[in-house]
C-alpha cells in the first residue's frame, strides 16, 4: 500500500471499538476525525460514508448541514469542530488508544491493495458497496429537490 493512512485507519478502528462498547457519541467523534483524514487523502467516498454513519446515529448532527464533507471543509464551523476533536484525540492519543486494542496496523494493511479499501473494510463494507450506497443516496437527494 502506497499512501500513509495510519491515522485514518486508527480513527476507524477506534470508531469500531466504540460501537462495540456501545458508546455512540465517541464513535461519532472518531468517525468525524476519520472523515477529515479521508478528505485529506482525497477519499471523498469514505468521508461521505462516515458522514452517513454519523447521521444514522444522530440525525441532528452538525454534519447534516452539508451534502458532502468536501463542502463542509469550506466552513469555519467544520474547522472549529475538527480542531476541537483533534485537541482531544491527537495522533499520539489515538495511537495510545489503539495500542490498548492490540491492533498491528502494518500487519493488517498488508492484506489490502489500497488505503481506501482498508478504510472501507473498517466501515464494514467493500468499497464497491460504499460507492453504490452513496450513489443511491445522491439519487434520492436529487429526486427530492
Predicted regions and their residues:
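Intrinsically disordered, low-complexity, charge-biased linker/tail regions
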Residues: 1-6, 56-145
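Generic helix N-cap/helix-start motif at coil->alpha-helix transitions
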Residues: 6-11, 26-28
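Canonical tetratricopeptide repeat
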Residues: 11, 44-45, 64-65
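Hydrophobic/aromatic side-chain positions at a characteristic register within alpha-helices
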Residues: 19-20, 39
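TPR-repeat structural position
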Residues: 24-25, 44
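Inward-facing hydrophobic residues that define packing positions of alpha-helical scaffold repeats
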Residues: 31-32, 38, 51
Amino acid at each position: 500500500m502506497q499512501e500513509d493512512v495510519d491515522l485514518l485507519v486508527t480513527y476507524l478502528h477506534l470508531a469500531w471499538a466504540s460501537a462495540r462498547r456501545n458508546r455512540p457519541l465517541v464513535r461519532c467523534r472518531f468517525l468525524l476525525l476519520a472523515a477529515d483524514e479521508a478528505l485529506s487523502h482525497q477519499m471523498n467516498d469514505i468521508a461521505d460514508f462516515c458522514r452517513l454513519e454519523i447521521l444514522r446515529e444522530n440525525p441532528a448532527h452538525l454534519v447534516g448541514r452539508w451534502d458532502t464533507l468536501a463542502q463542509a471543509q469550506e466552513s469555519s464551523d467544520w474547522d472549529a469542530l475538527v480542531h476541537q476533536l483533534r485537541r482531544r484525540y491527537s495522533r499520539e492519543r489515538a495511537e495510545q488508544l489503539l495500542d490498548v486494542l492490540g491492533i498491528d496496523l502494518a500487519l493488517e494493511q498488508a492484506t489490502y491493495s489500497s488505503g481506501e479499501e482498508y478504510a472501507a473494510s473498517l466501515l464494514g463494507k467493500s468499497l464497491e458497496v460504499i460507492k453504490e450506497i452513496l450513489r443511491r443516496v445522491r439519487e434520492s437527494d436529487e429526486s427530492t429537490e
